[in-house]
Regions:
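Short, positively charged
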Residues: 1-56, 60, 69-236
Length: 236
């Protein structure tokens, strides 16, 4: 059901064009992620599916929206990303990676001491990520980048300005608009942090270039016969 919710919502938005619909207001324009205005007779199978590199699924009144169905499986917020790519994002948003290095170091100590498992909830007393207001605000900036602006590999050519979260694509009263402050605050209580191996890590690690290895190494540990060092963030 959830996987069809996004095209159904876009189809509904097109039918509502020219009307005032809360929480969006007056809908004057509904376009694809790359700005092509949808025609009134658009069929669902003709709705443009955004590429994985795009952060927006649709443009409403010239603004980019990422669509999130509550009925679909929760998507990853940050998908198995190694330290070198987090460092790229830190450089883009103008932050030092040092606070994140500290959080990851604490995570590994807690995990090796068996106080936490691979997954740690943001609500856990042992969660080192965002364990104080300063860390949460630091993470807000980083996580917002992944939600709205790009990935560890690159800036998106199609960033989003808002998230349109919904339960039923046909009932506007179930829709909610999230911006860069409200999105993080809404997701934070449900966030799960993990450091994993199979996904995100180079398959030939540690036999990689010395330049890349030195950037990745601070997060990597050899546990259960595997090198683990990619940080994954999702909601539950």
């Amino acid at each position: 059901m959830g996987e069809q919710d996004e095209p159904r919502l876009i189809e509904n938005l097109v039918s509502l064009r020219g009307r005032h619909v809360e929480p969006l207001g007056d809908i004057t324009s509904v376009a694809s992620y790359n700005g092509v205005e949808y025609q009134a007779d658009i069929q669902r199978n003709r709705i443009w599916k955004a590429p994985t590199s795009a952060k927006r699924d649709v443009m409403i009144n010239g603004k980019g929206y990422s669509l999130k169905s509550i009925r679909a499986a929760p998507p990853a917020i940050v998908n198995h990303t190694t330290r070198d790519k987090w460092l790229r994002v830190c450089n883009v948003v103008g932050l030092s990676i040092d606070p994140l290095d500290e959080m990851v170091s604490e995570y590994w100590k807690l995990r090796i001491d068996r106080k936490i498992g691979e997954d740690v909830l943001s609500s856990s007393n042992y969660c080192p990520f965002g364990s104080n207001p300063q860390r949460r605000e630091y993470l807000r900036t980083l996580i917002n980048y992944f939600l709205f602006d790009g990935t560890g590999a690159q800036d998106s050519a199609y960033p989003a300005e808002y998230i349109l979260e919904f339960t039923d694509p046909l009932i506007p009263s179930t829709w909610r608009i999230l911006d860069k402050r409200s999105a993080f605050d809404s997701m934070w209580p449900k966030m799960v942090f993990s450091i994993r191996s199979k996904k995100g890590m180079p398959p030939d690690y540690p036999s990689i270039s010395a330049t890349k290895k030195v950037l990745m190494e601070p997060w990597v540990r050899h546990i259960d016969s595997d090198y683990r060092g990619s940080l994954h963030i999702r909601t539950r």
